[in-house]
Amino acid sequence: MAEDLVFELGADRSLLLVDDDEPFLKRLAKAMEKRGFVLETAQSVAEGKAIAQARPPAYAVVDLRLEDGNGLDVVEVLRERRPDCRIVVLTGYGAIATAVAAVKIGATDYLSKPADANEVTHALLAKGESLPPPPENPMSADRVRWEHIQRIYEMCDRNVSETARRLNMHRRTLQRILAKRSPR
């Protein structure tokens, strides 16, 4: 199994992991090293961009939300410096809009956290021609509406009044929706 994986990886097995969740980063780094990757890690957008500029890797796994900015900034630098880099974007916020944005900028795939090393490896090595199977449970209209509200809310820097204006709804209505669906 390990020999087959190294063969699939090719000559350049360099992998950049960018995530600000240190325990997750360490676990994933250890697991990916066992799978034959040669690792570099970064915990911020600035670190990730610096490594991408200096030593663009063959593979990259980038968290979407980092403390100092957006992981898509790292994806852009990786794409510029090494167009053949296979990039997987990870996020704890699985939304269609962010997945589309990540793929448009140049990500090869998009996974929701928590993703294990097998899922990440499969996404990094998957051939582009194979289409993923259709989802077993398609999103409901309520879920689509909620994700749209969340996307606009984040776009407005979590400003309820501005979000309500953009969504063409009363501020109190939006507050009730957010309160009802927020994690407790």
UniProtKB/Swiss-Prot annotation:
It comes from the Bacteria. Signal peptide: none annotated. The keyword DNA-binding applies. SUPFAM superfamilies: CheY-like. Phosphorylated by RegB. One of its GO terms (biological process) is phosphorelay signal transduction system. This is Photosynthetic apparatus regulatory protein RegA. The gene is regA.
